[in-house]
Amino acid sequence: MKIAVWHNLKSGGGNRALQQQIRGLALRGHQIEIWSNDGADNSFPDLKDLAPKLHLLELKTYIRFREQYRDGLSALFFGKDQHIKNMEAHSKACAEQINAGKFDVVLVHSCNQFFMPHIGQFINATPKVLYLHEPNRVLIEAWPDKLCWEAPAETKRWSALKADFFDQRQKRVWLRHERANYFTYDAVLVNSYFSNESLVRAYGQRGRVCYLGINEAEFPFLNLKREPFVLGLGTYYRHKGIDTAIEAVATIPAKMRPKLVWIGNDGGGGYYDAMVELAKQRGVVFEPQKNLSQTELVKILNTATCLIYTSRLEPFGYAPLEANACGLPVVAVAEGGVRETVIDGHNGIVTERDPVLLGAALQAVLNNTDLFEELLANARNWVKNKWSFEASIDRIEAALQAAAGRGVEERNAQAESLKQPIL
């Protein structure tokens, strides 16, 4: 197939998923071209030897003061703000080139800014498949402390109502466009059943689960000597739950308390500093690291004794499976997609977001050699049998071939069916 790809992703799990899919499809002989912008992460270390053709089109992100003022007035009438206009201009320019390229299918990945890509409304000559990692959770969940639609405290001061008049109306416009754009795609793929449930809650429609996989060649089991420390992976942001991990380690008696090594590629600032201070207060040796090479990451996955996974409602999460591939058991909070990748008592231990319960699970893995060896063996087989790279490419390839093989009438019927509510 001749496949066009569009994305606006930063570094992280979504970008790794994109690279894996492109690599796997390219190795099977499919011709691939990528559309993106300078603000996205297009370094693609996993694709250096394949060198797919990359088109970088302008995406304006800077908003001038007068545009901000105009957006505020426009929000009163539920008009589009400049951010949406800029993204639509970029998406339309990309779509014009894709429409003219005679592709068999378009694979669209998530948008770092809006989550839901806008490009679907402009692609009219080619079947289009959206791989959506998650909806815009800020618009539909209590994030981080309250739902963004929650009314402010009662007040009689007009100045205090600015957020309600302008900011919240802009959010409502974003949500309007998010829902409208969802229905422009011929098929929507998701990374877990949890993500599929999120689609139903956000859009009233489900997608199709298309599981990702792990390339064992990139995360090999090296059979190195294990050291008594706990490892965490994830950006230094609040939703990764680093505070939960620190509190869990702190429940382990001081004389046997392991250090907590945390590896992340992004984030910092106030939350990062707060976690360093929290660890000091709790008596936890906390070693945050950033931007490790693949070789360094694999080595530490092969020398740690346990991975603690505390992300909040993570839609999928690569880290537990990467750890399993390296023979590392996982202690995880039972939230989000991790309930599909970590089976309690098989390749790890799953429990509630309770530091005491998590700490007890960590101690069990750290101190019970028989349990550790059992989880290690199961973990490697779990990845090999259920989450292989080749199987994940089989799934995405089949989904794209199905979309490419549909006629215009069938695709139009599919698009209409997406608009029907689930009963």
Per-segment meaning from a language model:
Residues Y272-V298:
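Nucleotide-activated donor-binding/catalytic signature segment of Leloir-type glycosyltransferases, i.e.
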Residues K299-A304:
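Short alpha-helical donor nucleotide-sugar binding micro-motif in glycosyltransferases
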Residues R312:
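Aromatic "clamp/platform" in nucleotide-sugar-dependent glycosyltransferases that forms part
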Residues L189, L222-K240, I246-A250, L260-I263:
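Conserved donor-binding/catalytic core segment of Leloir-type glycosyltransferases
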Residues P329-A332, V342:
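Short hydrophobic beta-strand element within catalytic cores of glycosyltransferases
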Residues S36-D41, K259-A274, K290:
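Glycosyltransferase donor-sugar binding loop
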Residues D344-G345, I349-V356, A364-D370:
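Conserved acidic donor-binding segment of nucleotide-sugar-dependent glycosyltransferases
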Residues N136, L147-V188, N196-E197:
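Membrane-proximal helix-turn-helix segments that form the acceptor-binding/catalytic region
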